[in-house]
């Protein structure tokens, strides 16, 4: 099963789990501080920080590397938990995985949270796609992390994003190398861009409520998409859009706003 970490309030025995899904090139730990603060305020919930297939500690998963395969992995993980999964939150790439999980597997699911991700299909573009090209142009071994960050910077990647990406380097006898398989990452991203999940938003599974969180300084969720989400909510009464200040990495830029939303609506 997927590598994961369970987070609960001290001495709490939560009655339900929230699955937390990172973006491409990320790992479950990206969400640890937000979720620790959330469960302190809502000890009835526990959070499961998931490493999606071929990320973090989740290695050796067979192809195809698709959104549906990633969602099926979650279903297998949910079956091992002592309490039911009642909600799933996904950031960026993880947002689409969350929607596919709700559509195809999420028995007993009450809520889906899609954080700065779009349900729309489209041509591959944006920072994650640009990163794929950049890492293929730089060496696959480095003496230091700083050398890797500088190499990415020379390819047009901003220093903060390069520093974050360098957390995917592992140290061995011959220096630092990437622990991600970028061919697998490409397969996952191609499926992400190829998959249209508007039908899930416009006709959510029974009883499921969907919350979208748009980061105001990010272009991932266009105004056109926001209008369509709000229209879906007016029609079905189970979809809601929240706008928060911050860029795409809203869990780092504005964690307080996310925590407030989760405490209020979950």
Question: Language-model segments: what does each one mean?
Answer:
Residues 3-11, 32-35, 39-89, 93, ...:
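Active-site loop/oxyanion-hole signature of alpha/beta-hydrolase fold enzymes
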Residues 15-23:
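Short beta-strand element of the alpha/beta-hydrolase
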Residues 23-27, 92:
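Active-site glycine-rich loops that stabilize anionic/oxyanionic intermediates
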Residues 25, 52-56, 119, 247-250:
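Alpha/beta-hydrolase active-site loop signature
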Residues 99-103, 109-142:
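Flexible "cap/lid" loop of the alpha/beta hydrolase fold
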Residues 125, 141-193:
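Conserved alpha/beta-hydrolase catalytic His-Asp/Glu region
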Residues 173-234, 242:
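Conserved serine/cysteine hydrolase catalytic core
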Residues 243-259:
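Catalytic histidine-centered segment of alpha/beta-hydrolase-like enzymes
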């Amino acid at each position: 099963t997927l590598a994961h970490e369970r987070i609960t309030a001290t001495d709490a025995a939560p009655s339900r789990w929230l699955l937390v899904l990172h973006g491409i090139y990320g790992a479950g730990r990206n969400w640890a501080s937000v979720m620790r603060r959330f469960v302190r305020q809502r000890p009835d919930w526990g959070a499961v920080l998931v490493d999606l297939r071929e990320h973090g500690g989740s290695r050796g998963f067979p192809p195809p590397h698709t959104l549906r395969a990633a969602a099926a992995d979650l279903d297998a993980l949910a079956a091992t938990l002592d309490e039911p999964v009642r909600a799933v939150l996904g950031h960026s790439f993880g947002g689409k995985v969350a929607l596919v999980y709700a559509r195809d597997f999420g028995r007993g699911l009450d809520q889906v949270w899609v954080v700065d991700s779009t349900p729309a299909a489209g041509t591959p573009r944006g920072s994650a796609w640009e990163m794929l090209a950049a890492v293929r142009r730089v060496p696959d071994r480095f003496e230091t992390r700083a050398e890797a960050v500088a190499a990415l910077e020379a390819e047009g990647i901003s220093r903060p994003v390069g520093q974050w990406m360098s957390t995917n380097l592992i140290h061995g006898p011959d220096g630092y190398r990437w622990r991600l398989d970028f061919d697998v990452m490409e397969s996952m991203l191609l499926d992400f861009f190829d998959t249209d999940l508007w039908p899930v938003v416009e006709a959510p599974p029974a009883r499921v409520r969907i919350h979208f969180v748009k980061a105001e300084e990010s272009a991932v969720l266009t105004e056109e998409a926001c209008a369509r989400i709000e229209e879906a909510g007016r029609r079905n009464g189970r979809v809601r859009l929240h706008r928060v200040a911050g860029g795409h990495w809203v869990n780092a830029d504005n964690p307080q706003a996310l925590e407030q939303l989760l405490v209020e609506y979950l």
